[in-house]
Curated annotation (Swiss-Prot):
MF-aspect GO terms: DNA binding; DNA-binding transcription repressor activity, RNA polymerase II-specific
Organism: Gallus gallus (Chicken)
PROSITE patterns per the UniProt record, alphabetical: HOMEOBOX_2
Protein name (record): Homeobox protein AKR
Keywords on record: DNA-binding, Homeobox, Nucleus, Repressor, Transcription, Transcription regulation
Signal peptide: none
Source species, domain of life: Eukaryota
Matching PANTHER family: HOMEOBOX PROTEIN TRANSCRIPTION FACTORS
Purpose: Binds to the F' element of the APOVLDLII gene and represses its transcription.
Ion transport found in the keyword field: no
Length: 269
């Protein structure tokens, strides 16, 4: 009897342990599987509206943005839900609809991809227009070159052929080329013309310096201290990057000074 009671007690404890172990495991597994497998299905009325639209537009089942908004209002769904439904419907429902009509589904998918090509061409055309923007941005620099040519022409007249060659140099170079290396991107014919433009200011400056030497020799040794500034050798031809306005001011001041010195020499005589 004792052994039977002990066996009964042990068996009862084992069943209790099994119940306590099984219950939480079953609940957790069922709860976890319920959370994982649960899917929110759309309302039947909304799905029917979307199916009707898909069947009417089965040969081109790609709604526009306005049509998506209209369908979202009719079905009381968000536009994201409408887009996702059409993405899945084109893969699952649309091929069967087309096969019932005796059509090949692959033909309509290919035709849709073909219609997307104009969008790529639009992108290429927009990129092409961007490539022309630097040429339009170079136009503000043309007045600066015009003023530079005016200063060169004011110091000494230049032939009209060399003056007209200056805009061609700007057209064949970029803004960075004018700042860094203006001669590397120019045409071979234009390089010689640019050197012709550089030569007249140097000649004009040497002519003015010679006149200053003659005035200084006429005035005598007393004026050597004042004319010492003009005994320097002629400078090298300036680059295109230099500003000629400073040279123009120096020439004007020097001419005025020379005129004053000539008046003083005449008065002393």
């Amino acid at each position: 009897m004792k052994s039977k009671k002990g066996v009964v007690a042990i068996s009862g404890s084992e069943t209790e342990d099994d119940d306590t172990m099984d219950v939480p495991l079953d609940l957790s597994s069922s709860a976890g599987s319920g959370k994982r497998r649960r899917r929110g299905n759309l309302p039947k009325e909304s799905v029917q509206i979307l199916r009707d639209w898909l069947y009417e537009h089965r040969y081109n089942a790609y709604p526009s943005e306005q049509e998506k908004v209209l369908l979202s209002r009719q079905t009381h769904l968000s536009t994201l839900q409408v887009c996702n439904w059409f993405i899945n419907a084109r893969r699952r429902l649309l091929p069967d609809m087309l096969r019932k009509d005796g059509k090949d589904p692959n033909q309509f998918t290919i035709s849709r991809r073909g219609t997307k090509l104009p969008e790529g061409s639009m992108v290429e055309s927009s990129m092409g227009t961007k490539n022309f923007l630097p040429l339009l941005e170079e136009s503000p620099f043309l007045p600066a070159s015009a003023t530079l040519s005016k200063t060169v022409s004011s110091s000494k007249p230049v032939s009209p052929g060399s003056v007209l060659a200056r805009p061609s140099v700007i057209c064949h170079t970029t803004v960075t080329a004018l700042k860094d290396a203006p001669f590397h991107f120019c045409q071979p014919g234009d390089v010689g013309q640019t050197t012709d433009l550089q030569q007249p200011p140097a000649n004009a400056f040497t002519d003015s310096s010679l006149s200053y030497h003659e005035d200084a020799s006429k005035l005598g040794p007393g004026a050597n201290a004042q004319s010492g500034l003009f005994n320097t050798p002629p400078p090298t031809p300036p680059d295109l990057n230099q500003d000629f306005s400073g040279f123009q001011l120096l020439v004007d001041v020097a001419l005025k000074r020379a005129a004053e010195m000539e008046l003083q020499a005449k008065l002393m005589a």
